[in-house]
Amino acid sequence: MEAIPVLAGPTGSGKTFLALRLGEEVPVEVVSADATMVYRGLDIGTDKPTPEERARVPHHLVDVLEPHEAMSVARFLALAEEAIAHVLSRGKLPLVVGGTGYYIRALSEGLHDLPPPDPGVQEALWAELEARGLEALLAELARASPEDARRVGKNPRRLVRALEVLRRTGTPPARFPKRPPRFRYKKLVLWPDRAWLFPRLEERAKAQFARGLVEEVRGLLERYPRMPTALQAIGYKEVAGHLLGAYGLEEALERDIRAVKAYAKRQYTWFRHEPGDVVYLPRGGEEAYVGFRDWLCLHFGL
């Protein structure tokens, strides 16, 4: 089975730029592995490729859900594997691009075959999370399965799902049998120095505010006043807090910058332990393009 290329790395490292530039030279189609780009209407805060860019370089799993719809890792896996197969069937090369490590890990390593979600149990767990706090519930999961606790990290949605499975079945998710991956993957992880990345994250956040992020979030809140999961994304959550009167605009920007830097740190930690066929490229943005093309030439003949 031929391998599928994966371009991963922390937020702001230039993955979208590299994919778009490659797509202008080579007949590739992007399969997005980004947990927020799946949502329609979340454009500025996700740095989503524009419709014009996506017309030049086809993208899959972008703008496929409304903000109130849920995207689980199982749903992502099914959609992504379907998209990859579709691209291959037309003689094109799929390029998986994204920074949602959990999605990329599911693609390349397979996914545990868990029972379907139970909304009632999940609702009770969300209430418990609000009352007891994330650390208390994470400690409960860690006692049963340190592996699951490491995997969910501080992601409340994944924590709720893991505890739901544990409490319903008595078995933590990591001990369920795993469905093998449908395809084989080779991964290139952008690994720029933090001194290079973090100032760019600050400038990107400021640019998003200048481009109209506040207006984008205001429109989403008018349509979805109950703050669905999609509006908990970095940037959207911080701006929503401002629009709901919790703090001023300047503090919203400061919170956004802190949140995106913290997210990038978590991505560095996650991708540092990426399994499988992985190469780390110690650059980002335009500086990484030559290394990216060399890697593609070596492994894929592009």
From Swiss-Prot:
InterPro entries: Dimethylallyltransferase, IPT, P-loop_NTPase. ATP binds at G9, P10, T11, G12, S13, G14, K15, T16. GO terms for molecular function: ATP binding; tRNA dimethylallyltransferase activity. Substrate binds at T11, G12, S13, G14, K15, T16. It catalyses: adenosine(37) in tRNA + dimethylallyl diphosphate = N(6)-dimethylallyladenosine(37) in tRNA + diphosphate. GO terms for biological process: tRNA modification. Keywords: ATP-binding, Magnesium, Nucleotide-binding, Transferase, tRNA processing. Its EC number is 2.5.1.75. Pfam families: IPPT. The record marks T100 as: Interaction with substrate tRNA. Its cofactor is Mg(2+). Belongs to the IPP transferase family. Catalyzes the transfer of a dimethylallyl group onto the adenine at position 37 in tRNAs that read codons beginning with uridine, leading to the formation of N6-(dimethylallyl)adenosine (i(6)A). Monomer. This is tRNA dimethylallyltransferase.
